[in-house]
Amino acid sequence: MIGKDYFCKNYFNMDLSKILSISGKPGLFKLVGEAKSNIIVESLIDGKKIPAFSHERISSLHEISIYTHGEDLPLYEVLKNLYTLQQGKAVDNPKKMDGKSLKSLFEQVAPDFDEEAVYASDMKKVFTWYNLLLEKDLLDFSEEDENNSTEPTEEEGVEPEK
């Protein structure tokens, strides 16, 4: 069975595994290199390259999911839903949205989200990330051409679904 990492990297023409969130630092970062004791990241906001160390809380966007009342919803699904809802346009200034507006918009892109576990600050962060990824042209939800699919075959070690 194909895992969600494969789905995220190959079903859509984008790779969120190299886009990082670093706790305590604004915006998102692109992984650009590795060193012995750290990684080198480039800010998507200002383009500056900085080191990020193992003691910092670093999360790849493809690892992030939204708490729901059922199975957690991967962030890329929320971003895709938001892209579709907004028709490829940015969300109007998420930092100035009130709680009711945030919740209303978030319910449209993650209908079953857990209201006790997902805070307004989380919603603002998702909308801000969406705007930043959109601005930097890093959101591509077009599906790959079936003829050019990079989906692994049985010979490559992936068993067919039963």
Language-model segments: what does each one mean?
Residues Y6, F29, Y67, F113, ...:
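Aromatic side chains
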Residues V91, K95, G99, K103-A117, ...:
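Conserved interaction-surface patches within small, structured recognition/assembly domains
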Residues M1-F12, L139-K162:
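Intrinsically disordered, compositionally biased charged tails
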Residues A110-E144:
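Positively charged, low-complexity, intrinsically disordered RNA-binding extensions
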